């Protein structure tokens, strides 16, 4: 169980499935949460998680994620969609994410605020991708 009073920069609510209440934020994977906190501390950039649209924990697949998405409870809840609150160039943002050790990295440049997907999938399944004009372009890492 995560001791949220000991977590800096984030609250349980920021990871919740909006259809299942704040307590669903407890499902976020602890190791993954540690990596997100480290990313926030190392960069100094605030991280705005897109939890209100299912961009963190997805308890039952109600938010349109792929069947094996790492957002899903069945896959360990080790993914978020977010954007940084920074003016840093996208290339620098990518470098910081990759340097932090995330093994699934997606870039969504056409959102209202260009944003990211990060997850902690097994290394042998590592992927980097971008989503442009309704199409995913995948790159092996």
Question: Which residue ranges define each predicted feature?
Answer:
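Active-site acidic/histidine clusters and adjacent loop/turn architecture
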Residues: 1-46
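Alpha-helix initiation/capping motif
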Residues: 11, 22, 29-30, 55, ...
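Extended, low-complexity, intrinsically disordered C-terminal regulatory tails
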Residues: 31-67
